[in-house]
Regions:
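A transmembrane-helix-recognition feature enriched in membrane-embedded lipid enzymes
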Residues: 1-33
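A short, well-structured juxtamembrane/interface segment
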Residues: 21-46, 52-58
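Catalytic core of membrane glycerolipid acyltransferases/transacylases, capturing the structured
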Residues: 46-100
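Short gly/pro/ser/thr-enriched loop/turn and capping motifs at secondary-structure boundaries
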Residues: 77-79, 101-102, 127-129, 155-160
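Hydrophobic beta-strand scaffold residues
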Residues: 92-93, 119, 148
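Catalytic-site beta-strand/loop segments enriched in glycine and acidic/polar residues
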Residues: 108-140, 144, 201
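A cross-family acyltransferase "interaction/gating" segment
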Residues: 132-192
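Charged phosphate-binding loop/patch that engages nucleotide di/tri-phosphates or the phosphate backbone
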Residues: 200-222
Length: 222
C-alpha cells in the first residue's frame, strides 16, 4: 500500500464516522412498515435487509451502533468503509463480494445470522450495475432460511455524487423516509426459474418503495 493510501486509510474512517454521526443527528426520519411488517420486531427472528447501494449513507448513519452484520469489499474503498462502520459501532464487516471470495463471505454472513445478528446487504453492490439485483442476497436467504426485507431510505434535500451508483448524501436538517416492505421468503429448494422470478420481484419491490419514499418526501405529509 502506498504512503498516500496508508495516510488516507488512517484519517478517512474517523473523519467519515464523525461526519455521518453529526449529519444524521440533524435529519428527521420517518419509518414506515417497520413495526407492522417485520416479524423480527416481536419475536427477534433475525432478518436480511436489502437496499440499493446509493442509499448507504443514510442507512449506515441512522442505524449506527446496532448489532448488524454487513459486508465490505476487499478493495481500498472497502477497507475504508469497513473501518468507518466499526467506528460507527457496527461489528466488523464480512470481507468479500459476489466477485471476490463470495462463497466464504456468504458463509460468514450466515454465521452472523445464527449468532443473533441481522444482516444488511446492497444487492447491486459493490460495483453495479446500478439497481440490478445480483444473486448473493437471494442465495444467502435461500441457504439460511432467513427472510429478506427490502428497504428504501431516501432523504430530501440531498446531493448526488458521481460514480456508478450516483450515491446520495442528505444535507443537514433534511427529511428522511425509510420504508420497509413485506419480508420475502426464498425456498431452499428453489429452481433457477424461481430464483430469476424472485430477483425480478426484489428489484420491482425496491423500485416501488424507493419511488414511494421520494413521493412522500415531496409531499407535505413527509
Amino acid at each position: 500500500m502506498s504512503l498516500k493510501r496508508r495516510f488516507l486509510r488512517r484519517i478517512l474512517p474517523p473523519a467519515l464516522a464523525f461526519f455521518l454521526r453529526m449529519l444524521l443527528a440533524t435529519v428527521r426520519v420517518r419509518e414506515l412498515g417497520r413495526a407492522e411488517r417485520l416479524p423480527g420486531i416481536q419475536g427477534r427472528k433475525r432478518l436480511i435487509f436489502a437496499f440499493w447501494h446509493n442509499e448507504m449513507v443514510p442507512v449506515v448513519g441512522f442505524y449506527a451502533g446496532r448489532d448488524i452484520q454487513s459486508m465490505a469489499s476487499r478493495s481500498f474503498d472497502g477497507e475504508v468503509i469497513a473501518d468507518t462502520l466499526i467506528r460507527l459501532g457496527y461489528p466488523a464487516p464480512t470481507r468479500g463480494s459476489s466477485s471476490n471470495n463470495g462463497r466464504q463471505a456468504l458463509k460468514a454472513l450466515a454465521r452472523g445470522l445464527r449468532e443473533g445478528r441481522d444482516v444488511v446487504l446492497t444487492p447491486d453492490g459493490p460495483m453495479g450495475p446500478r439497481h440490478k439485483v445480483q444473486s448473493g442476497v437471494l442465495t444467502l436467504a435461500r441457504l439460511t432460511g432467513y427472510q429478506l426485507v427490502p428497504l428504501a431510505f431516501r432523504c430530501r434535500p440531498a446531493i448526488k455524487l458521481g460514480g456508478w451508483d450516483r450515491m446520495e448524501i442528505p444535507l443537514p436538517f433534511a427529511k428522511g423516509c425509510a420504508i420497509f416492505a413485506n419480508p420475502i421468503t426464498v425456498p431452499r429448494e428453489c429452481s433457477e426459474e424461481e430464483m430469476d422470478a424472485l430477483r425480478d420481484h426484489l428489484e420491482e419491490t425496491l423500485r416501488t418503495i424507493d419511488e414511494q419514499a421520494v413521493r412522500l418526501l415531496s409531499s407535505r405529509a413527509a
